[in-house]
Amino acid sequence: EFASAARAVKKADPKASLTYFSSDPNFLAGLVRQAGGRWYDVTDSTVKVIMTQDAASRKVADFWQKLINEGSIPVHEGYTPQVYKQMNEDTLISELYGIWDTALIAQNVPKGKGKWAVAPLPEWPDRPGGADMGGSATVVLKGSKNAEAAVRFATWMSTDPQAVSILISKGGLWPASTTGLANKALQKPDAFYSNDKVFVPFIDVAKNLKYDWVWGPTQVQAGQDMENNLVKVSKSYPMTKALADTQESTLAKLKKQGIKVG
C-alpha cells in the first residue's frame, strides 16, 4: 500500500515524492527493527555482525531499493535545508521519522501548518507494530567542575514530571519510562497539526514495542560508516552493498579493538 501510494504521488506530480529514504543510519535501523531484524548477536565473549545475513534487513533493503530504482523515492540526508525546502514547497509530503520529528517539522516547515498530520508507521503484514528510532543519553563527563550538581540536574531533567513535560511540549521528546506515558503533555493539542493530539497515536505503539534490538560496541563508528554508505545508494550502489560495506568496516574496527568476532 505504501509503495503504491509512492508511485501514485510521483505519477500525479513528477516533481513531488511521498517521502524519501534517509541516509541517517537510525532510520534504517528503525525500519529493520520494526521488521523483526537485528544487526548484531552479542554474547559475553563474542560479537557477530549479521547485517548482510539478516533476512529482515534484506527485506527492508529490497523494498526501498525497488522504489529508489524506479524513481518513486529519492535518497537524501536527513534534517537538511534541501529537505525542509521541499516540504515547504509541498513536493515532499511525508517523513518516516520518530515522534520528535513533529517539533522539527513545525520549526522548519512554517508553510506546512495545517497540512501535516501524524500516523503510525506502515506495518509489515507478518509483524505488526512499530519500533524505536534513535534515542539519547545524558552524560556528565569526567573532570567536570560541577559533576555532582550536573548529575542532580540531569536526573531532574530526565525524571521529574514537570521537566519531562517541557521536553515533550518544547522538544517533541518521548518519555523513556512507562509511567511517563501518563504525562498530561502527551494529550496537548498542537496548533501546527490542526490542533491534533499528535502524541496520542504513539501511546499504544510504545506499550507494545518489542525490546529485543542490540547495538554493537562500536556503533558510533559503525553508524558513521553506514551513513557515508547509505547516502550513495542508487541503482549502481544498492542498499545491500551499503550494508555489506558497513559490515566489513565494522568487523575490522571490532578486531582492531581486540574484540572477538564470531
What annotation goes with each model-predicted range?
Residues 93-98, 117:
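Paired acidic/hydrophobic, glycine-rich loop segments that form the ligand-binding mouth/hinge
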Residues 69, 205-262:
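Conserved C-terminal helix/tail region of periplasmic/extracytoplasmic solute-binding proteins
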Residues 11-23, 160-170, 252-262:
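Bilobed periplasmic-binding protein-like "clamshell/Venus-flytrap" ligand-binding domains
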Residues 3-16, 84-88, 101-109, 251-255:
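Pocket-flanking alpha-helical
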Residues 2-49, 56, 92-94:
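Extracytoplasmic/periplasmic solute-binding protein
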Residues 4-8, 46-77, 121:
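Glycine-centered hinge/linker elements that transmit conformational signals in sensory
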Residues 1-3, 75-89, 123:
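Short helix-initiation/N-cap motifs at beta->coil->alpha
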